[in-house]
Amino acid sequence: MLSIMAQHVERGDTVHIDVSHGLRHLPMIALLAALHLRVARDAKIGAIWYGAFDPDTNEAPVHNLVGLLRIADWIQALHTYDKDGDYGVFSPLLGPAGELLGRAAFFERTTNSVKAREALSGWASRKDRFLVDDPAAELFREELEHRVRWHRQPDRASWEKELAKRYLEQGDYVRAAIYGLEAAISAQAIQSGADVGDFGQRDSARDELKSSQGFRTLNNLRNALAHGVRPSDQAIERALKDETNLRNALKRLLTQLLGLERKQGA
């Protein structure tokens, strides 16, 4: 059925689907067909119509079930975020306020946590950050706010630590290493009473950390990951042999430098 529908829909068409008359499983197939047409044909689903006769009132109201696709959009966005950490996928679902979330995602993924936090805080302070006329947005509100909660951390070292932890969990090892290094530098600057946002003072904090074997190892591992630099350290060479070794090495280094909590069984 999905193949037949796709054969009769041109790219960019608007499609209305009527599931009023058919087998009971037809609405479920229609929903899959709608999702398939949006991806395979870039089609717009104008409506999914369902009419049901009510013998008590002798009327047959017709309902538009297209709102189910909105829920599917949110589920897909959550899945995408959990896979790669890019909450910019929520931006199109949030109306005008979504632009701030998209900006925050861009800055975070280009490792500018200060700008990312600024945009996230701006989004979180808006009353219209979720569309009031979108029940699906309300349904997923708590999940989204939970996923971007790092910006509520009290200081830069804390929020960079959260980002390092999250990217490690998502298997983005380059960003995990970068944010781990930045968190260590921020923590050192704070401990020294330096201005954590001043580049010169951050460089001084970095120099102070070079005496730490863990910091040097993490920095070398980051260089190997980001630039393809051949490691001279045998420990790093072992870490790069497979993903399990790499994940464990990063977890160990981040725990050593930042006190990253270990999950039970890890």
Give each language-model segment a name:
Residues 1-14, 29-266:
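Long, low-complexity, Lys/Arg-enriched
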Residues 19-32:
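Gly/Ser/Thr-rich loops at beta-strand to alpha-helix junctions
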